[in-house]
Amino acid sequence: MHNSPLYAAIDLGSNSFHMLVVREVAGALRTVTKVKRKVRLAAGLDPEFRLSRAAMERGWDCLRLFSEQLQDIPADNIRVVGTATLRLATNVDEFLSEAERVLNHSIEIISGEEEAKTIYEGVSWTSAGEGNRLVIDIGGASTELVIGEHSEAKLLNSLHMGCVTWLNNHFGDGELSEARFKQAIAAAKAVLEKVAEDYRALGWRTCVGASGTVQALQEIMLAQGKSERVTLPKLQELMGQAIACGKLDQLQLEGLAAERLTVFPSGLAILIAIFETLGIESMTLAGGALREGLIYGLLGNNHDCDARDRTADSLINRYQLDKEHAERVRDTAVEAFNQLQPAWRLSKRYGRPILRYAALLHEIGLCIEYKKAPQHAAYIIDNIDMPGFTPAQKKLLSALLFNQRDEFKLEPLEKQGAVTGRQAIRLARILRIALILCMRRTQGTVPRFTLEADEDALTLTLPSGWLDEHYLRASELRFEVERQQKMGWPTRLLEA
């Protein structure tokens, strides 16, 4: 593993410069280094689109930090790109000359279309989703909108608006008033109207955001006890909170990091305009974007599968799990889910996939030790990078693994934000029964079964005589029935 090569992607953005260094491990990327520095290059553009000397100096100083890390990476494994501000700057050659000398590496100024396409590449690798997917990336001086399916981008645009330019244009004096927000939103809508109909006509099933603005929003949502899905009412509520602060230098929102304060109102205004213009219902945070797209472009890997499947396969390989047994538990859990879904109104979109991955990864805690394997499994999931899984999905997965056996621990099931607490508890009940039915660990030993539910009441029916012939599993099922009844959930075990 230690001999696998390093890869690096550097994004010279309009607000921040970012460096990502990774290596490939067990078919997945492992982050080795992430460095971000706020440069605010776009703030250094004058009316003639010339970069100020001060802005260029900030950029060069940042690249001196990056250059040390690049010395250990083969040149063919490095890609450095500049985006919107460097596309606009009329004196870009002056900046690039010194920047390339400092880095000892060439820098590409990519077009807005290529930036949008690469962002989509990064999202398709690191975020799960079926059907058409709308990707939104609000940068410092441009906003990319892409609709695609799997790895194919179908419609893409790079629009001339960003959180730094909108800050300068609409919040430059630091006033956070309703009038200023209305002005900023209206200006963003004017830009969007040129392309909006194309997006509405093509349509999308899921929407993900790939920018610092959306990252900040999710941090705020979680800190304020809300679900991770971004909606227009939540955005409008946050706008109200910002307006109540009055001034940019007095802005305080629970969960908003200090480094994001300055450009948050302008990014929020742009996002509200996008939601209102396109009619977006909800959005979640993407797992990656431009830098990840650059890395996967260097690797040249085929990725026509769910990002979460790649992550699960990587973890199965890395922790040497019994894949055949894991798949048997998965199939049993999904069969149980399908039987109970109508009565329990379980979420096919949000609940079933995470139940599948919980079944596949249920033995991951055994790599530490058996007695506390469920706790170890939850700890691993909580603390490991899992491309394709949102933070709320990871919390649900962790909660299910924590509750796979022994006494129920309800708090993590109720606190996750991917599904309701009641649904999470019901998924845990399903997983526990599936694990017991699969205890023999060999093909053909899982019995036919029927699960029926009436509110919290659950009945498991097995073939006649099966319980007498399978003493261990019968005993474990009876213990499980007792545990679930103890929680106030009527549970029965029958034969027919």
Curated annotation (Swiss-Prot):
EC numbers: 3.6.1.40
Pfam families assigned: Ppx-GppA, Ppx-GppA_III
Statement: the UniProt record of this protein carries the keyword Hydrolase: yes
Catalytic activity: guanosine 3'-diphosphate 5'-triphosphate + H2O = guanosine 3',5'-bis(diphosphate) + phosphate + H(+)
Top enzyme category: hydrolase
Keyword Disulfide bond attached: no
The entry's keywords: Hydrolase
InterPro entries per UniProt: ATPase_NBD, GppA/Ppx_hydrolase, Guo-5TP_3DP_PyrP, Ppx_GppA_C, Ppx_GppA_N, PyroPPase_GppA_Ppx
Single GO molecular function: guanosine-5'-triphosphate,3'-diphosphate diphosphatase activity
GO BP term (any one): guanosine pentaphosphate catabolic process
Superkingdom in the source lineage: Bacteria
Pathway linked to the protein: Purine metabolism; ppGpp biosynthesis; ppGpp from GTP: step 2/2
Family statement: Belongs to the GppA/Ppx family. GppA subfamily.
Its biological purpose: Catalyzes the conversion of pppGpp to ppGpp. Guanosine pentaphosphate (pppGpp) is a cytoplasmic signaling molecule which together with ppGpp controls the 'stringent response', an adaptive process that allows bacteria to respond to amino acid starvation, resulting in the coordinated regulation of numerous cellular activities.
PANTHER family: EXOPOLYPHOSPHATASE (PTHR30005), RETROGRADE REGULATION PROTEIN 2 (PTHR30005:SF0)
Protein name according to UniProt: Guanosine-5'-triphosphate,3'-diphosphate pyrophosphatase
Organism of this sequence: Aeromonas hydrophila subsp. hydrophila (strain ATCC 7966 / DSM 30187 / BCRC 13018 / CCUG 14551 / JCM 1027 / KCTC 2358 / NCIMB 9240 / NCTC 8049)
